[in-house]
Swiss-Prot record:
NCBIfam families: plsB, PRK04974.1. It is an enzyme of class 2 (transferase). It is a peripheral membrane protein. Keywords: Acyltransferase, Cell inner membrane, Cell membrane, Lipid biosynthesis, Lipid metabolism, Membrane, Phospholipid biosynthesis, Phospholipid metabolism, Transferase. A motif (HXXXXD motif) lies at residues 308-313. PANTHER family: DIHYDROXYACETONE PHOSPHATE ACYLTRANSFERASE, GLYCEROL-3-PHOSPHATE ACYLTRANSFERASE. The keyword Glycoprotein does not apply. It holds the Pfam family Acyltransferase. It is found in: Cell inner membrane. This is Glycerol-3-phosphate acyltransferase. The lineage of its organism: Bacteria, Pseudomonadati, Pseudomonadota, Gammaproteobacteria, Alteromonadales. GO terms for biological process: CDP-diacylglycerol biosynthetic process; fatty acid metabolic process.
Length: 807
């Protein structure tokens, strides 16, 4: 009888099964790690442990992977399925010695010499009982509570108290065929393989648990001794005519206000609450791109998460997802408005550090905050902050605030040794709990002061909120970014470390825009966002169900056949499936009659639904522009369409943070899809297929309000070519309000003053404002914008502009 079949062993495994709850990282190793089920597979683990292998066995059975208890047999040669680098540790004395693992590696490698077709996949597996990183300078406690190399007694206690927090992590497989072909099969290669595995396990533990935590007061005293804070204390004392001791006490108060107080115990409690909460609120959370972030952590990068900001739930969602993806929740920069009892202390122990909305010229506070942020980077803690500065009320990305990005870039310039990498994150929801409040605020109601009831009050109305979406975008490594934007940055800083380089501000602005673009590049399309887009483009926010489903199928085809970026996610299924999901979420209404179902958006929430449409409007705005061009312009050729796209893309890029490298090529590929879908026929020019005209009309409706804005701007510029930016912003906003009142435009962003400010900056940059060279293009672009509008809207704009000129 084998050991694992003995009654004692079965009893031990049964007991462990009752005590242990295991989370697998990643959740689907076959897909996420590209494991090949047709090839043999072996596991390598750091330490030999009965409980670890039992936990691994439970997971392999669920995942359909080979059991660690089954011997690996290839060509008559038997080898253990699991190779352990260290023996078990006895209660007293030293760990068992020997190099049995070297023999195992040699046997696994040698069979490849005999069979040229063989390729064994060696998969590193790490197990964690709890994820406490430990404290700095806590030698006695570390000796008593040793987690990395526990005795069997210590392991029993760990299972008893931390069994519900067991993580099994699979890593990318090593091809032993590649190792044998490239390096040979002798003992030296086996030893090298073992060394690489040890380094891997050491790095993997740091990714899972994070660096050791500092003692808070010791950290404060160390920071107060830094050169920058010492200098700021002296300046504060001199300027405020107080003693240095008083200035130091004030600096200590600032540190206490700012600094996080991370607690692994609280994170474990929060994890249970959040698991309950997500299961109650959402049917699932869709994640894309987590593996690339895990790899960055493993490669030693300092990670800064820069997500978009939709809801207060963002703070919780991203930390929760990272925890379950085998990474440490980041230290989160939270607005000081969230530092209220009891939420503030809880957020602080969950990793939040607090930042004032404005530093207000307070040099001491600025020095304290910067030094604290530097310390986080130096120690290796991941950080998270929202570059928008606040939650978007319209569903579009807000213009970025550059303060935190500038401080992060300054930390790199000051010599952070590890590569610092920004990871843009797109967060999306089928239902944002605060969305009704946002529209009240946009309509003029005063924003309520933050309170625990405002943040969590919606939990009392728990319902079906659909799904959440977390997509990780293209990372930006700051050292590489600086090399690209300012190749001589190292020399410039070395010459005069205290002098702010002249290139820094424009580089920060470029970085901010790239972050926002990369967030939008990782957008998640959902049933709610896509059905909102279609229905809001219809005249009465209503369509026959068959027509709606057909339109959704067209959009899905465009998004899948011409992916916006590799980071964008598009739902599986058909238009019928998306409509069914929207009805289930009660975002849509259905009315039935003998002629068929009619799907609509309730007029009372139509404005609210613009929020969800705006989340992904950038994905469909160019197809919409192309559809409008095909419908409005007679004898429209491919060249005509590309010229229109080239005229308007720079404004769309600035307004919607778009990142299409070659708009002309993209437009041509969209036209190819239109032809393939039978929407148009192409000869010398395009001819719209009459039976498909409604599909093009609906598609063109998505950009209609955007084109109305552009028509207002260019009509104003034509009649007042010497307008200053401020005058253009004021006049265009006033005309937008008039147009909205006359034509029933309710989308909140249509009246957003900040949006017109963004566009005016871009117009100046493009040379369309006074004293620039692009004035000759204004008439052409105005005519193209006017052409793409309905005649009634076009006439209102023309009449209003001339009335404005005559006042």
């Amino acid at each position: 009888m084998s050991k694992q079949d003995s009654l004692w062993f079965k009893s031990l495994r049964w007991l462990q099964r009752q005590l242990v709850h295991t989370v697998v990282v990643p959740h689907d190793p076959f897909d996420d790690l590209n494991l090949d089920p047709s090839k043999p597979l072996a596991y390598v683990m750091k330490t030999e442990s009965v409980s670890d292998i039992a936990a691994l066995s439970e997971m392999t059975a669920k995942l359909g992977l080979p059991s660690p208890y089954e011997e690996l047999e290839v060509n008559g040669v038997k080898a253990p399925r699991v190779v352990c680098l260290e023996g078990s540790k006895p209660l007293f004395g030293q760990r068992e010695g020997g190099e049995q693992y070297i023999d195992c590696f040699k046997r696994l490698l040698s069979v490849h010499k005999q069979n040229r077709e063989l390729d064994i996949q060696l998969v590193p597996v790490s197990l964690y009982w709890g994820r406490t990183p430990g404290k700095e300078d806590d030698t006695m406690r570390a000796a008593v509570l040793e987690r990395q190399n526990p005795t069997w007694l210590r392991k029993c206690l760990m299972i008893l108290f931390l069994g519900r927090h067991n993580f099994v992590q699979f890593s990318n497989a090593v091809s032993l065929r590649y190792m044998a072909d490239e390096h040979g099969t002798d003992k030296r290669i086996a030893q090298k393989l073992a060394r690489v595995a040890r380094v891997h396990f050491q790095r993997q533990r740091k990714v899972m648990t994070g660096p050791q935590l500092p003692k808070r007061q010791a950290l404060f005293h160390a920071l107060l001794k830094s050169d920058s804070i010492t200098k700021a204390i002296k300046e504060e004392a001199a300027s405020k005519k107080i003693t240095e001791a008083e200035a130091r006490a004030k600096a200590m108060e600032y540190l206490d206000e700012v600094a996080a107080d991370y607690s692994d115990s609280l994170v474990r409690i929060a994890e249970r609450f959040l698991t309950w909460l997500w299961n109650k609120l959402y049917k699932g959370i869709n994640i894309k791109g987590a593996e690339q972030v895990r790899q960055l952590h493993h490669d030693g990068h300092e990670i800064v998460y820069v997500p978009c900001h939709r809801s207060h739930m963002d703070y919780l969602l991203l930390s929760y997802i990272l925890y379950y993806q085998g990474m440490v929740p980041p230290h989160i920069a939270a607005g000081i408005n969230l530092n209220f009892w009891p939420a503030g202390p809880a957020f602080r122990r969950g990793g939040a550090f607090f930042i004032r909305r404005s530093f207000g010229g307070n040099k001491l506070y600025t020095a304290v905050f910067r030094e604290y942020l530097d310390q986080l980077f130096t120690k290796g803690y991941s950080v998270e902050y929202f570059t928008e500065g606040g939650r978007s009320r319209t569903g579009r990305l807000l213009a970025p605030k550059t303060g935190m990005l500038a401080m992060t870039l300054n930390s790199v310039l000051r010599g952070v040794e590890r590569p610092v990498t920004l990871v843009p994150v797109y967060l999306g929801y089928d239902h944002v709990m605060e969305v009704a409040t946002y529209h009240k605020e946009l309509s003029g109601k005063k924003k309520k002061k933050e309170s625990v009831w405002q943040v969590f009050g919606a939990i009392r109305k728990l319902g079906n909120f659909g799904q959440g979406y977390v997509n990780f975008g293209e990372p930006i490594t700051l050292h590489n970014f600086l090399n690209e934007q300012a190749p001589s940055w190292r020399e410039d800083i070395a010459k005069d470390p205290d002098q702010k380089p002249s290139w820094l501000t424009p580089v920060v602005n470029t970085l901010a825009n790239r972050v926002m673009t990369n967030i939008n590049d990782a957008a998640a399309v959902s049933s709610v966002t896509l059905t909102s887009m279609v229905l809001l483009a219809s005249e009465q926010n209503a369509l026959e169900r068959s027509q709606l489903e057909k339109q959704l199928d067209l959009y899905l085809t465009i998004l899948k056949e011409q992916p916006y970026t590799e980071y964008t996610s598009v739902p599986e299924g058909t238009g019928h499936d998306l409509v069914s999901q929207g009805l289930e979420l009660k975002k849509l209404q259905i009315e039935s009659d003998p002629l068929g179902d009619i799907i609509s958006i309730d007029q009372s929430i139509a404005i609210t639904m613009t929020y969800y449409r705006n989340n992904i409007i950038h994905l469909m705005v160019l197809p919409s522009l192309i559809a409008a061009c095909l419908l409005r312009k007679e004898n429209c050729s491919r060249e005509d369409v590309i010229c229109v796209v080239n005229d308007f893309y720079p404004l769309l890029e600035a307004e919607l943070f778009m990142g299409i490298d070659d708009p002309a090529q993209y437009a041509s590929q969209i036209l190819d899809i239109f032809v393939a879908q039978g929407l148009v026929v192409e000869a010398e020019h395009f001819e719209v297929v009459e039976s498909k005209i409604n599909q093009l009309l609906l598609l063109s409706g998505t950009i209609s309000e955007t084109m109305q804005r552009y028509a207002i701007l260019f009509n104003l510029l034509e009649v007042k070519p010497n307008m200053e930016r401020s005058e253009l912003e004021k006049d265009s906003h006033r005309l937008a309000q008039r147009l909205g009142a006359l034509h029933g435009i309710t989308a909140p962003e249509f009246y957003d003053k900040k949006l017109y400010a963004t566009l005016s900056v871009k117009l100046k940059e493009l040379g369309y404002l006074a004293d620039n060279q692009g004035c000759s293009d204004i008439k052409r672009i105005k005519e193209r914008a006017n052409l793409l509008l309905r005649s009634s809207v076009r006439q209102t704009i023309v009449d209003s502009v001339h009335a404005e000129q005559n006042t």
